[in-house]
């Protein structure tokens, strides 16, 4: 097997491991690490389990059995994201790799965080360790797209989501005496997937019309997970702020500013779902404030 194929095989394992930290590693990135002996055996592996605790590299080295410690000098460590080079809640992983005397490091992608940005790779190379960067780079970047957007664009990762009929209608509210009767596009399976998605995101936003007509809870009910922060957007609101745990904002700029302010203090909103309605979704599209769009299309018109 060619070295390129070998590197990709172990990087795939890093990505598998990294995904285990999806819910608890935030606001840190998801990272996986695998240590492979010169004979091609995995002697250690780990992932970043929880924010504030050991990084993937630390956990991978901890998993190495005492009898295999002597193999590290000829081993290769695979890591999906560049090792950190600064002191934060934990010491630099780049220093740890150098101390362990690893022969080679294979890195999926460079960390865009301003305190790293290639410094970890440079430090390891200066120590005489062979470094390969960019193995499965696209997959590694996509895994942490929320982290990357937050650190490069200073805003949360924004997903626009809607359900529509086969001929492109998002749906409508037929106003009756009770002021609410909505066209139902989703089914039981897609509802479950929607709730799974909510559990993976930090906040969810709707416009004033949707809020007043439907009063959506926007909670996680058909999946296990934490409820996202509910946000309502309307240009008619005079004041911004929280009312009964719901955040009300009157502009897109105010939305971003409020989220950034809260991220600097307590609540970390790294990702946002925008569920509509149509006017609200269009405002995000017109402003270029989106990273991903997911559309559920019904088989009827």
Regions found by a protein language model. Give the residues of each.
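Short beta-strand scaffold segments in enzyme catalytic cores
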Residues: 31-40, 162-163
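Local cysteine-cluster metal-coordination motifs and their immediate loop/turn environment
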Residues: 47, 54-57, 77-96
């Amino acid at each position: 097997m060619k070295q390129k194929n070998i590197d990709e095989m172990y990087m795939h394992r890093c990505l598998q491991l990294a995904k285990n930290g999806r819910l608890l590693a935030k606001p840190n990135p998801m990272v996986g690490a695998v240590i492979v002996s010169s004979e091609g055996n995995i002697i250690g592996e780990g992932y970043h389990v929880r924010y504030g605790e050991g990084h993937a590299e630390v956990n991978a080295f901890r998993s190495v059995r005492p009898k295999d410690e002597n193999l590290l000098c000829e081993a290769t460590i695979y890591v999906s994201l560049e090792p950190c080079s600064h002191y934060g809640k934990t010491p630099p992983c780049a220093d740890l790799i150098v101390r362990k005397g690893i022969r080679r490091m294979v890195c999926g992608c460079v960390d865009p965080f301003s305190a790293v940005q290639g410094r970890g790779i440079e430090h390891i190379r200066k120590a005489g360790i062979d470094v390969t960067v960019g193995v499965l780079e696209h997959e590694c970047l996509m895994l942490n797209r929320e982290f990357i957007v937050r650190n490069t664009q200073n805003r949360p990762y924004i997903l626009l989501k809607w359900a529509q009929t086969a001929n492109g209608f998002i749906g409508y509210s037929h106003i009756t005496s009770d002021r609410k009767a909505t066209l139902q596009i989703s089914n039981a399976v897609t509802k479950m997937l929607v709730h799974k998605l909510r559990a993976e995101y930090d906040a969810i936003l709707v416009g004033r019309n949707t809020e007043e007509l439907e009063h959506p809870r926007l909670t996680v009910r058909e999946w296990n997970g934490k409820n996202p922060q509910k946000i309502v957007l309307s240009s008619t609101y005079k004041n911004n702020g929280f009312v009964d745990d719901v955040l009300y904002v009157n502009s897109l700029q105010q939305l971003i500013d409020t989220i950034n302010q809260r991220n600097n203090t307590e609540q970390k909103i790294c990702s946002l779902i925008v569920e509509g309605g149509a006017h609200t979704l269009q405002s995000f599209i017109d402003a270029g404030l989106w990273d991903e769009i997911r559309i559920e299309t019904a088989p009827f018109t």
